[in-house]
Structures are given as C-alpha cells and as structure tokens.
C-alpha cells in the first residue's frame, strides 16, 4: 500500500541551488496525507498538506468544490500551471490509492465495512546548514496507531504489528526501501532547496519573541510565574526556569509550541514558587532571532497584559493542524528517482503511477 508524496516538479533545478548553497540552521520539508473512510457516504475524504519548516505551502482536499492542489504560500504561487496540474493529478491518484488501501487494511484487521477508518502518512527530509540530507522520513499509521515506518538508515522497516509485517515482507521483496532512499536523498533534497531559495524572504527570516513574565497568585503561600514567548519564527525555541542559577526542569510546566495563526508561534513555561521568593527565579530564553539568550524576571511593578485572543486563535489553529496532520506511520513507497521520468517497476507490490510527474513515486499496495 502506498501514499503518494507531493514531489512537485520534475524540472531541472537551477545552478543557484547547487549543493554548495548554504542556509542558516537546519530546514525540513514534510507532507502529511490523511484519508478517512465514510461508509454509505461516498468515497473516503483525502486531505494533503505540505510544509517547509513551519510554513504550510500546499493543500489539497478531495471534498472541495473543485479539488485542486492549492498554494498556501506566496513563494509557491510563482510555479506555473503545469506544476499545479501535476500536483492535482498526483493527489487524485493518491486518493484512489488510499481508497484501495483502506479496504485492504480493513481486511488485514478483520474489520466490518460499517465503521469509519483513517489512513495517515508523513514523509519528507531534513537538511543541515550545508544543504545536505540530515534525515529522511516515510511513516504510516492506521486508525491513529503506528503501522509501518522507514528506519533512520533508510534501508529497513519497522512494522508495528503482524498486519504491518505482511506489508513489510512485500516491500522488502520489492526493494521499496531503496526507492524511498533514492527519493529522499535526491528529489526531496533538491525540491526543499528550491523552495528555500524561492521563499527565502519568508522561510529564512528570524522574528524574535516578544517576552513577558506574569504572576498568578495561587494562595497566600504560592504563586505561578509564567514566562511567555510570543510572535516568534521559526518555531524552535528554548524556555527554562532557574532558581538561584539551578535548572528547575522537573518543576516546570512547559506547553508545546503553538501556531499563532499569523505565521508566527507562541510558547510559555510556568513554575510554582513560594510567595515572596519570586526574585530568586529567572526565565532563560534562546531563539534564532535573539542576538543572545535572554534572562527574564518577574517585575512586580508592571504586570503585562497577555493577548489572550491571540492565544485562543493559536490554540484553534493547533487543533486544525493536529486533525489534518496528526501523522506518524501508515504505508507508502515511491518509484526510483530517474530525473523525474517514470521508471520501470515490476514489483508485485507496486505499480508505477508517476509518469511525467515529479513525484518520483510508485503506488504500492499493502
């Protein structure tokens, strides 16, 4: 079984994107596919979203009035109509592949036709500061549980249960991992570098966090100190609390980084302290947009107002992203990269459906 990955364009990449090109920090490209069956209500709904770093740049929804690959970032809008035609056809093929795979998985798990089931996948690659591959991913899940995943060596698979072992044996016989590795080390890297160049004003920016420390009395004896970081990009940030210079990791409540809804992110870290001892505690913050790490204390004279509305919006966006991209592992394989042209594929588990596209994929059956 296979999830098709949006390997968007098979055009030759420009010399400006040569391997010697470098960027500050590491970067990533991720695609998330979700197919949900709905017995008695037509074909499964298929949704795909693609991200470079923390920025969504493409989306497809089979339930749209006119389903097409849609740009979600200005720097991808410059791609021509042929690009979007290929993207759209790719997603439509993948929706049909997932429909077949959902049926096969239902059989693997001896499930009835009555219930709704979900097939998810994530794939992509990470680049280091030198523009070279750090790590590749190809992971799949069924009904919210791990199914099968390509290991970090890009040469072997980890199956979560006996059903996934059936798929694993098929893929091992078909040498699917080799095709996965060829894509991840080739086109995935090339296209991520292309996107980083085209979108460098957005993707390679660094917006420092707006910072506050707030004080929230719990009782006459205790209070919560909360260290806020708002409006920062990229999403990677470090927040820690110290008391008299000693880390308070075990006693710190730390939320996941949240999208703010405007392309930036939010995060906070909180610690409960004895009343009257607040000045012994310091918040330490590190972010790419800061010239040097910050050290913050609560200032009793000025309790800043935290933009609660923005935080609520951020939480709403987080929920949407979790629904669309709550992905880890499910099933997938790609045809071998060969300059973007459809390669021959005789494996019983897979069939080539990437002719004339940049997907460099094969559609595989579980």
Swiss-Prot record:
It is found in: Membrane. Residues 25-114 are annotated as: Alpha-1. It holds the Pfam family C1-set. This is Class I histocompatibility antigen, Gogo-C*0201 alpha chain. Its main location: membrane. Residues 1-24 form the signal peptide. One of its GO terms (cellular component) is MHC class I protein complex. GO terms for biological process: antigen processing and presentation of endogenous peptide antigen via MHC class I via ER pathway, TAP-independent; antigen processing and presentation of endogenous peptide antigen via MHC class Ib; immune response; positive regulation of T cell mediated cytotoxicity. Involved in the presentation of foreign antigens to the immune system. Glycans are attached at residue 110. Residues 209-297 form the Ig-like C1-type domain. Residues 299-308 are annotated as: Connecting peptide. It comes from the Eukaryota. The keyword Signal applies. Disulfide bonds join 125-188, 227-283. Heterodimer of an alpha chain and a beta chain (beta-2-microglobulin). It is a single-pass type I membrane protein. The chain crosses the membrane at residues 309-333. Residues 25-308 are extracellular. Residues 207-298 are annotated as: Alpha-3. Residues 115-206 are annotated as: Alpha-2. Belongs to the MHC class I family. Residues 334-366 are cytoplasmic. SMART domains: IGc1. GO terms for molecular function: peptide antigen binding; signaling receptor binding. Keywords: Disulfide bond, Glycoprotein, Immunity, Membrane, MHC I, Signal, Transmembrane, Transmembrane helix.
């Amino acid at each position: 079984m296979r999830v098709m990955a949006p390997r968007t364009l098979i055009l030759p990449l420009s010399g400006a994107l040569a391997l010697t090109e470098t960027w500050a920090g590491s970067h990533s490209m991720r695609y998330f596919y979700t197919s949900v069956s709905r017995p008695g209500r037509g074909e499964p709904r298929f949704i795909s979203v693609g991200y470079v770093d923390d920025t969504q740049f493409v989306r497809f929804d089979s339930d749209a009035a006119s389903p097409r690959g849609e740009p979600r970032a200005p720097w991808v809008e410059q791609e021509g109509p042929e690009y979007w035609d290929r993207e759209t056809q790719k997603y439509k093929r993948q929706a049909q592949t997932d429909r077949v795979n959902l049926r096969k998985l239902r059989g693997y798990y001896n499930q009835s036709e009555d219930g709704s089931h979900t097939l998810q996948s994530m794939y992509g690659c990470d680049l280091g500061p030198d523009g070279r591959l750090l790590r590749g991913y190809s992971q799949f899940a069924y009904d919210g549980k791990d199914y099968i995943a390509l290991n970090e060596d890009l040469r072997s698979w980890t199956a979560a249960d006996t059903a996934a072992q059936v798929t694993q044996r098929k893929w091992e016989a078909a040498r699917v991992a080799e095709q996965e590795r060829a894509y991840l080390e080739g086109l995935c890297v090339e296209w991520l570098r292309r996107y980083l160049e085209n979108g460098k004003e957005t993707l390679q920016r660094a917006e420092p966090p707006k910072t506050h420390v707030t004080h929230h009395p719990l009782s006459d004896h205790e209070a919560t100190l909360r260290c806020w970081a708002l409006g920062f990009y990229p999403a990677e940030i470090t927040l820690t609390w110290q008391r008299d210079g000693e880390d308070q990791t075990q006693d710190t409540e730390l939320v996941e980084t949240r999208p703010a809804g405007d392309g930036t992110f939010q995060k906070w870290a909180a610690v409960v302290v004895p009343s009257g001892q607040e000045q012994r505690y310091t918040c330490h913050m590190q972010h790419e947009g800061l010239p040097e790490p910050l050290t913050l204390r609560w200032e009793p004279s000025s309790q800043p107002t935290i933009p609660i509305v923005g935080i609520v919006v951020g939480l709403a966006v987080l929920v949407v992203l979790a629904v669309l991209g709550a992905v880890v592992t499910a099933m997938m394989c790609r045809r071998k990269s060969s300059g973007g042209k459809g390669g021959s594929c005789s494996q019983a588990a897979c069939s080539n459906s990437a002719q004339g596209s940049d997907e460099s994929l094969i559609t595989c059956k579980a």
